[in-house]
Amino acid sequence: MKHPKLFTACIAVLSMSLGACGIHLESSATHLPALTGFALSRDASARTEAAAAQRAHSLAALASECSSCASSLEALAQSSQQRLDFLGGVWDPWKDQENTANLPQPEEVAEAPYRIEEFISWLVISARRDLRAASNPTTSSPEQSRQLSAVALGRYASAVQLAQAYAIDIDAGDQGVDALAQRFTQATGATPNWLVRQGASSDLTLPQVSQTISAFSSSNEAATSTVSWDCIAQTLPKSAVHTTDFYEAETIENALLDRASRSLERGSKDSRQLRCSLANTSPSDLAQASLRADVNLLQSDSQDVRLFGVQAALDDLRLWAGAPTVTFPAVVTLQ
């Protein structure tokens, strides 16, 4: 084999999803307890953050000739650790028992990709995986949806910020990650379930929001968020006047107005004000307000409403990323 290290890394990276895919076993002293539903999604997310923190630390140590790159990687490592702590850590099935040395243990946390562009794409792909789970009301309650999406959106924001630091697109490593997956499949006969394969449908892509109006017409969350998006859009021209180099303001304004219109077209109650201006007009404050409006939709019991909020949040994390004074929290919550 010409590239044993790369092959080993491939196996390590892609085994993470397989290790968390949940073989349902009876709980006993000789078998791992069953891990299903939201608990399975939560642990997959936690394992991703643990792997991301480890890889970001190691890459930062190698970036000696680019101090800004090293700083961005260390920031990502810290954010990943915060998200891991927010989730409660990686699943420990025997934490309340003594003498666990001889008991079966979950798979160890696997390694994330080594190359920067592939690492970034891996972060994005895993975020979409978690957001799909968070948008499904049959597998996650509103509270669980907000918890999982808070981590996934924070991870996506970290990917966007790291891509900016290296001046590359967030999807620049998609082909490389796909190649790793193909090598893994050839070696094991299995397909990593977290990968969005090119040219093929996948359970990990976000479903499209349907055009039916019933979910939005009965959603208080959709009505409230629509008002917020419209008001933020009306405030943006004032913010642009008072903020130096806020070149993104018009683009963001148009995106928010379009989002509000699409929400109304789907049946959301129209409670917009003819004239509306927020008191806090800094780009940072407006970005936070917009993300709160997005995440608010995850309190809905409707998959369509949740999906609309998820897509809005992903759009906002990209739209606001270059605005002056704007930074994103490690965990994107309603607060």
Task: Go through the PLM ranges and name each one.
Residues 22-335:
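All-alpha RGS (Regulator of G-protein Signaling) helical domain and cognate RGS-like helical scaffolds
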Residues 16-20:
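C-terminal motif of bacterial Sec signal peptides marking the signal peptidase cleavage site
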Residues 1-13, 145, 306:
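N-terminal export and membrane-targeting signals
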